[in-house]
């Protein structure tokens, strides 16, 4: 008599009252009955940063069928430098020390070969590195 639950009150449905699915299982099966035995939890978080992939062109199609293509450098580029292995000091308040954003001035259909040979963002990383070095000294 003790193995079965008591009957429900008058007027209640009996469809949800049943014996638990964990009855008769081993103690190790009570903790993870739905997971396969080959499943291993990762003990630590990943230590390498995730880098977003940037496409070299942006293609948009309007409802009437017109195709617009914006090539490099006519769209905004965001990039991050690799973080240091050990941080000596935290960044300044309200300053993100590793993220830079370069926004173009206009749309250029042709890509100049001199643009690809030069660093298009010369002051971005050196500015943040000078801030960090001046604070850590």
Curated annotation (Swiss-Prot):
This is Uncharacterized protein ycf72. It comes from the Eukaryota. It is found in: Plastid, Chloroplast. Keywords: Chloroplast, Plastid. The keyword Chloroplast applies. Belongs to the ycf72 family. GO terms for cellular component: chloroplast; plastid. Transmembrane segments: none annotated. PANTHER family: RIBULOSE BISPHOSPHATE CARBOXYLASE LARGE CHAIN (PTHR37377), SMALL RIBOSOMAL SUBUNIT PROTEIN US2C (PTHR37377:SF2).
């Amino acid at each position: 008599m003790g193995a079965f639950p008591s009957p429900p009150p008058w007027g209640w449905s009996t469809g949800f009252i049943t014996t638990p699915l964990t009855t008769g299982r081993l103690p190790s099966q009570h903790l993870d009955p739905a997971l396969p035995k080959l499943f291993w939890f990762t003990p630590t978080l990943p230590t390498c940063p995730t880098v977003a992939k940037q496409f070299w062109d942006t293609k948009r199609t309007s409802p009437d069928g017109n195709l617009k293509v914006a090539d490099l450098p006519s769209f905004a580029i965001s990039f991050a430098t690799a973080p240091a292995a050990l941080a000596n000091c935290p960044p300044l308040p309200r300053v993100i020390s590793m993220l830079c954003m370069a926004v173009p001035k206009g749309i250029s259909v042709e890509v100049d070969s001199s643009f690809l040979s030069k660093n298009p963002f010369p002051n971005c990383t050196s500015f943040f590195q000078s801030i960090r070095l001046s604070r850590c000294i």
